Amino acid sequence: MVLANKTTASTRSGAGRNLYWLLLLCLSGVALATDIYSGRIDTPALTIVAPLWTSTLVVTLLGFWAVPMLRSLKASQVIQEDGPQSHLKKAGTPTMGGIFFMPVALVLGWAWVAANSVNLLEVSAAVLLTLCLGLVGWFDDWQILRKKSNKGISAKLRLGIELGSGLIFGLWLFLTRSDISGLALPFGLSLPIGVLFLAISTFVVAAESNAVNLTDGMDGLAAGTSAIAFLGLALVVAPSWPGLMIFCACFSGSCLGFLAHNHNPAQVFMGDTGSLALGGALAAVGLITNTLWALLILSGLFLVESLSVIAQVTYYKATKGPDGVGKRLFKMSPIHHHFEQSGWPEVRVVSTFYACVAVLAVAACGLNALS
């Protein structure tokens, strides 16, 4: 029995590692191919593949120091007792991994853009918004570790900061950009929204950051899907916003570098420090470049994860009987746990979700090309 368990664990470890290498090769190939096709390869500093590979390498190497450090600091993930029973074995795995891969993405992205003098103001704004949400996530992680429970800062406080950050960011864009009051749509169409842009900005920042946060529930899930989404967004904004293309490439690469330590079985989790910041970075680029339609497609999986939680809670409350117990739409939410509870191995769920985001990325890039 012990030998069988070891064999199963070894097989899962190999499957997670193989999935990581497949994703790394695929994203690298796409980045290189599009750089060659577009002619960007003639100017290596303004390609996608160069910052992507650089950030991947830096984060991968940094992880060999950061992960043991987090472990020595006893920054261990608190596992929910009412969560999937298979996750109990993850107890003791260090969390707050966002503290070593997010700074690489932010610093490298900003420095790369500054060195090439492209879209520096816009990238600086994206860095500030991402940093703000990352700090909120870090404080939440710290409170969870300090209390040894899953209760960090209050949900109202966290949501308030997210909404406030989105409002301030939107106000800056609205006051400095004359084109931002029209919501860009595919095929050159535009929807005049005027001051409603502020409400959209506020919602997008909060929704995107929380959606990525909800997706971070399996080894390699949030990191891998975010890497694909950032590369897709980089391809969408590349023709008009080379600086933000580089910013997205650095984030995609940093996610891949983190995934080297986060693939199944994970040696570290990103925590709210990483997931909230990733969502904030995606939202920032979508808002600045007025490509929210593309962001909506690229974030389709994150949206489904969020909707599954909303639907689960709503249905449970609506069907609550005299005994105070309601019915559930899913075996567990977010929806990735539903598949896990249905008997799917983690790696199968994660690989399926990777494929879904890849299809969405192709759709977003294809629609952008047609437009």
From Swiss-Prot:
GO terms for molecular function: metal ion binding; phospho-N-acetylmuramoyl-pentapeptide-transferase activity; UDP-N-acetylmuramoyl-L-alanyl-D-glutamyl-meso-2,6-diaminopimelyl-D-alanyl-D-alanine:undecaprenyl-phosphate transferase activity. InterPro entries: Glycosyl_transferase_4 (IPR000715), PNAcMuramoyl-5peptid_Trfase (IPR003524), PNAcMuramoyl-5peptid_Trfase_CS (IPR018480). GO terms for cellular component: plasma membrane. Pfam families: Glycos_transf_4, MraY_sig1. It comes from the Bacteria. Pathway: Cell wall biogenesis; peptidoglycan biosynthesis. One of its GO terms (biological process) is regulation of cell shape. PROSITE patterns: MRAY_1, MRAY_2. It catalyses: UDP-N-acetyl-alpha-D-muramoyl-L-alanyl-gamma-D-glutamyl-meso-2,6-diaminopimeloyl-D-alanyl-D-alanine + di-trans,octa-cis-undecaprenyl phosphate = di-trans,octa-cis-undecaprenyl diphospho-N-acetyl-alpha-D-muramoyl-L-alanyl-D-glutamyl-meso-2,6-diaminopimeloyl-D-alanyl-D-alanine + UMP. Its cofactor is Mg(2+). It is found in: Cell inner membrane. Keywords: Cell cycle, Cell division, Cell inner membrane, Cell membrane, Cell shape, Cell wall biogenesis/degradation, Magnesium, Membrane, Metal-binding, Peptidoglycan synthesis, Transferase, Transmembrane, Transmembrane helix. The chain crosses the membrane at residues 19-39, 48-68, 95-115, 119-139, 155-175, 180-200, 227-247, 284-304, 349-369. CDD domains: GT_MraY. Belongs to the glycosyltransferase 4 family. MraY subfamily. Catalyzes the initial step of the lipid cycle reactions in the biosynthesis of the cell wall peptidoglycan: transfers peptidoglycan precursor phospho-MurNAc-pentapeptide from UDP-MurNAc-pentapeptide onto the lipid carrier undecaprenyl phosphate, yielding undecaprenyl-pyrophosphoryl-MurNAc-pentapeptide, known as lipid I. NCBIfam families: mraY (TIGR00445). This is Phospho-N-acetylmuramoyl-pentapeptide-transferase. It comes from Acaryochloris marina (strain MBIC 11017).
